């Protein structure tokens, strides 16, 4: 404990902010002045539905401006930052943490410009409902790509070094997937083997006429 100066961290996607539970939580935290930081990750889409069909003004931080604390009353601090702006993300999260921890004020960070590498499920490819321009924008503003550019621009590493790290990460991911899948299958395979053994025993007894009446 830090003498009660802890921070509760929450995270939610932009589409889920259209649900009633989100608004109930936001209101209650504002009333109680809960020292929390909630991040809203906004890619402007829900499950195949654009923000224009689910969020007033297509902007959750815009419609929550009335919750911003001011000289007239307590409320929230609301910060807006772009997902691909790494330095600004660090500044924003540090600032939000400081406010919540030291002043016991709830904070919302609206992270805009998120990208969606894949659809919301294996059956829902986002190529079906996004324009070619939007898909290209997402490729150009992918957070990993932008972070890599930031690293190269500051001379922290070369592009060749980053490419090597990427290849190593992909290899480790594939190998890890195989290991995890084998572990996951080990018990079912064992149980199946035991069940087959029992069934074969029953079959053999039946062939010997043990179960005949």
Q: What do these predicted ranges mean?
A:
Residues 1-188:
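Glycine-rich ThDP/TPP pyrophosphate-binding loop and its adjacent helix/strand module
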């Amino acid at each position: 404990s830090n003498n009660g100066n802890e921070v509760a961290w929450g995270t939610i996607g932009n589409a889920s902010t259209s649900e009633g539970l989100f608004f109930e939580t936001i209101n209650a935290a504002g009333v109680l002045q809960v020292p929390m930081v909630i991040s809203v990750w906004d890619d402007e889409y829900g499950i195949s539905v654009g923000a224009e069909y689910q969020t007033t003004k297509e902007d959750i931080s815009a419609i929550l401006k009335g919750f911003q604390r001011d000289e007239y009353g307590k409320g929230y601090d609301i910060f807006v930052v772009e997902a691909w702006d790494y330095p600004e993300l660090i500044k924003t999260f540090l600032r939000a943490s400081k406010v919540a921890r030291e002043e016991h004020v709830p904070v919302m960070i609206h992270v805009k410009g998120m990208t969606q590498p894949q659809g919301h499920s294996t059956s829902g490819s986002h190529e079906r409902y996004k324009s070619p321009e939007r898909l290209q924008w997402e490729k150009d503003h992918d957070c990993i790509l932008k972070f890599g550019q930031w690293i190269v621009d500051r001379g922290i590493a070369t592009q060749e070094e980053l490419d090597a790290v990427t290849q190593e990460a992909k290899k480790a991911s594939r190998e890890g997937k195989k290991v995890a899948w084998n572990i996951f299958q080990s018990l079912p395979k064992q149980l199946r083997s035991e069940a087959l053994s029992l069934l074969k025993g029953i079959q053999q007894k039946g062939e010997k006429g043990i179960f005949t009446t």
